[in-house]
């Protein structure tokens, strides 16, 4: 069975007798899978909140190192301001621009499920936590002048305008993608953390990594429930998303050189992506599934 909306985009139905303008104003109605997963979302949200270790962006930004830019009478960024190794700043910029594109991922989750009740609470929480990462990364990097803020802003605008769309994914594909996507970013951050000497930045990247691990757990547990509800479709969904998952930053057109630098530094590359996918499939207990064995074997 395929869990997509009948008339609406992804997760809800709309009365066919309504005009187009009126239909767009109607409150969406959750479909079967959205309702099936709602108790699991509630359970996972409670666990997520009960186990949180709250942290704040301002605690990880050395504001005493900051100074005004030329617009306010100071001086603009210069390459000599950078003190971190290139592979570290490249990885940080990849991570930051990825986080800047959060709106697209939020939209796809809302369109595939529903921004109501416990689903709405989870999507709001996940979005807030992901946005925190963008806030703190940009604050740290701009205050410490480790990146060219003007060039970074140009890439941010370009990438956000390019956007992210997954409207061809089924609901289960969306969950499978999110679980593997979060795992990839967690591994990216852990490997980056291991190569940072500056203690504040090291702790910051570790915080982000922990959030990514917790997000992976949430989405992965929803997929685990889908395996009990519609196993065949879920296995197929995992296979489709595993086959197309890309390296972290691979979709940032302006940063392909940085993606190569990060790969050469051993932070994240195609080999590590394959390990991410294999480990996630194994964690779901699916390593012996015929359609997934291609992702397990080296």
Predicted regions: what is each one?
Residues 2, 13, 20-22:
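Short, positively charged and aromatic/hydrophobic N-terminal segments
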Residues 5-10:
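Residue-identity detector for glycine
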Residues 19-298:
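Non-heme di-metal
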């Amino acid at each position: 069975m395929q869990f997509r909306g009948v008339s609406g985009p992804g997760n809800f139905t709309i009365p066919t007798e309504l005009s187009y303008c009126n239909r767009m104003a109607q409150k969406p109605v959750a479909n079967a899978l959205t309702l099936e997963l709602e108790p699991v979302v509630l359970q996972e949200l409670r666990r997520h909140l009960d186990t949180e270790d709250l942290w704040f962006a301002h605690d990880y930004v050395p504001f005493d190192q900051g100074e005004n830019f030329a617009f306010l009478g100071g001086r603009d960024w210069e390459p000599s301001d950078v003190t971190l190794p290139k592979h570290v700043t490249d990885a940080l910029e990849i991570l930051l621009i990825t986080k800047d594109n959060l709106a697209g991922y939020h939209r796809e989750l809302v369109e595939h499920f529903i921004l109501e009740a416990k689903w709405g609470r989870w999507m709001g929480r996940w979005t807030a936590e992901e946005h925190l990462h963008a806030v703190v990364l940009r604050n740290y990097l701009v205050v410490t002048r480790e990146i060219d803020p003007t060039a970074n802003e140009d890439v941010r605008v370009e990438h956000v305008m390019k956007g992210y769309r997954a409207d061809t994914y089924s609901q289960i594909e969306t969950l499978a993608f999110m679980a593997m996507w979060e795992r990839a970013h967690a591994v990216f951050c852990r490997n980056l953390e291991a190569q940072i000497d500056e203690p504040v930045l090291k702790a910051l990247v570790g915080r982000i990594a922990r959030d990514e691990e917790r997000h992976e757990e949430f989405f992965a547990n929803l997929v685990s429930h889908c395996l009990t509800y519609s196993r065949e479709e879920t296995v197929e969904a995992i296979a489709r998303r595993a086959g197309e998952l890309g390296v972290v930053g691979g979709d940032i057109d302006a940063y392909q050189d940085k993606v190569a630098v990060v790969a050469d530094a051993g932070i994240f590359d195609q080999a590590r992506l394959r390990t991410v996918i294999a480990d996630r499939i194994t964690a779901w207990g699916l390593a012996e599934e015929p359609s997934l064995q291609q992702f397990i074997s080296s």
